[in-house]
C-alpha cells in the first residue's frame, strides 16, 4: 500500500530536506554539530531545557531578569517578567533569575555546581537591552568553569538580524546550544531549531530505547524545511546580512541624531536591524502635564502615541518593546533600501516632532487612550 503512491497516504520516511537544511544551517554556525527541528521558538526552549538536564544530570536553570523565552510551562519558568508568569504556577521549581549584565550574580548562581544551563538572549528582545562589553564572553567562561551549558536564545537576534548570522558572532561566542525560529522560515511557516554540540545530543539519546525521548511530530515537516532552505538561499544570494549591517548602522546613526533635538527621546540603541528608541519624562511644563496624564492611566502608555501614527500615517509597523516600558522596538526587513531608510527617518521625525507640540492631534490621541484605559480599569466614570 505504501508503494502504491495513493494521494491519501503520507509517506513514512525521514525527509531529506531536514538533512539538507541542517547541513546548510551548520555551515553558517562553526562549532555547532547537531540540529533538532521543531515548530517554534518556545518548542526550541523546551527542547533545550530537556537536553541540558539530560546531558548534565543537573536540575537547575538560570536566566536573566526581563528575559523572554516563550509562554509554554517550561519556557515560562525562564520568563523574566511576572506579568506573564502570574496565575500559571507553580512553574519549574529550579529556575533562578539573575540581573542582566551582572556577572557577579551569575557567578554566585553557578557556585553550587547544580546548574544545568544558563539561558540568555545576546540582546534582550524586551527593551532591546544590549550586553555590556565582555559580558557574554565572561559569562561563557563562568559557565565552562562551573560545568554549566551556555544556551543562547537567538530567536529574535539570529538569521542576520544584527548584521551577523548570529548576534553572538559579534563576540565570537561558542555556545553549547543555540535556539532559532521565526526568521528561519522568513516568518511564514512555523519552525524552530536547536543546534548544539554532538556530546549533548549523544548524552540525551544515548541508547536505542532513548532514541524517542524527545521529538516533534511536525518538527521537520517538508514545508518548514523547504522554507528554511529558501531563506538561507536568499540571505546568501542577496547578501542580506551584509545589507543589514551596513544599512542598520546608518539608520541607527540617523535616529540617534534626533536625541539632542527632542527632550522626550532619551536614547537610540541597537545592532543591525534591531533598534530601540527609548523615551522618558520631559522637562518642559506643558509636556510634563500631558505625560502625567498618560502615566495616571498606565505606565508606558506614551509609546502608543508614537506606534499608532507610525502605522496609520506612515505605514510603518513598530511595537512597544515590553510591558510598562518607554521603549519602541523597530525591526526593519533585512532588504531595507536607501529609500526605505529615508522613509523611516522622516516618519519618526514627523511623529516625535508632533509629540513635542501641545496641543496637537497626537496628544488628543493620548487623551483618548488614557480615558479608555481608565474606563476599562474602573478608574474613570
State the predicted function of each range.
Residues 1-381:
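Conserved N-terminal phosphate-binding loop of PLP-dependent enzymes in the Aspartate aminotransferase
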Amino acid at each position: 500500500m505504501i508503494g502504491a503512491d495513493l494521494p491519501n497516504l503520507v509517506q513514512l520516511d525521514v525527509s531529506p530536506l531536514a538533512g539538507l537544511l541542517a547541513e546548510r544551517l551548520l555551515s553558517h554556525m562553526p562549532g555547532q554539530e547537531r540540529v533538532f527541528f521543531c515548530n517554534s521558538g518556545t518548542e526550541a526552549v523546551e527542547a533545550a531545557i530537556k537536553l541540558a538536564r539530560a546531558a548534565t544530570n543537573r536540575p537547575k536553570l538560570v536566566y536573566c531578569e526581563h528575559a523572554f523565552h516563550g509562554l509554554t510551562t517550561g519556557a515560562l519558568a525562564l520568563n523574566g517578567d511576572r506579568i506573564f508568569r502570574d496565575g500559571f504556577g507553580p512553574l519549574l521549581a529550579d529556575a533562578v533569575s539573575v540581573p542582566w549584565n551582572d556577572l557577579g550574580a551569575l557567578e554566585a548562581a553557578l557556585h553550587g555546581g547544580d546548574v544545568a544551563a544558563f539561558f540568555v538572549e545576546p540582546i534582550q528582545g524586551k527593551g532591546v537591552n544590549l550586553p555590556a562589553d565582555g559580558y557574554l564572553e565572561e559569562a561563557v567562561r563562568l559557565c565552562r568553569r562551573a560545568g554549566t551549558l551556555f544556551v543562547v536564545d537567538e530567536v529574535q537576534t539570529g538569521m542576520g538580524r544584527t548584521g551577523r548570522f548570529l548576534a553572538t558572532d559579534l563576540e565570537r561566542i561558542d555556545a553549547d546550544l543555540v535556539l532559532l525560529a521565526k526568521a528561519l522560515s522568513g516568518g511564514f511557516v512555523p519552525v524552530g531549531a536547536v543546534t548544539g554540540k554532538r556530546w549533548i545530543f549523544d548524552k540525551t539519546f544515548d541508547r536505542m530505547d532513548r532514541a524517542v525521548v524527545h521529538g516533534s511530530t511536525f518538527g521537520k515537516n517538508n514545508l518548514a524545511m523547504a522554507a528554511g532552505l529558501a531563506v538561507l538561499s536568499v540571505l546568501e544570494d542577496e547578501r542580506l546580512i551584509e545589507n543589514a549591517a551596513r544599512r542598520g548602522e546608518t539608520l541607527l546613526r540617523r535616529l540617534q541624531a534626533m536625541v539632542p533635538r527632542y527632550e522626550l527621546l532619551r536614547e537610540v540603541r541597537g545592532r543591525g536591524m534591531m533598534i530601540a528608541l527609548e523615551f522618558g519624562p520631559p522637562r518642559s511644563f506643558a509636556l510634563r502635564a500631558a505625560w502625567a496624564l498618560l502615566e495616571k492611566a498606565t505606565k508606558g502608555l506614551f509609546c502608543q502615541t508614537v506606534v499608532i501614527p507610525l502605522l496609520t500615517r506612515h505605514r510603518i509597523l513598530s511595537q512597544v518593546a515590553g510591558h510598562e516600558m518607554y521603549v519602541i522596538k523597530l525591526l526593519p526587513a533585512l532588504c531595507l533600501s536607501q529609500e526605505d531608510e529615508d522613509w523611516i527617518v522622516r516618519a519618526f521625525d514627523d511623529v516625535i516632532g508632533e509629540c513635542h507640540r501641545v496641543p496637537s492631534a497626537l496628544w488628543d490621541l493620548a487623551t483618548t487612550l488614557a480615558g479608555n484605559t481608565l474606563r476599562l480599569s474602573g478608574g474613570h466614570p
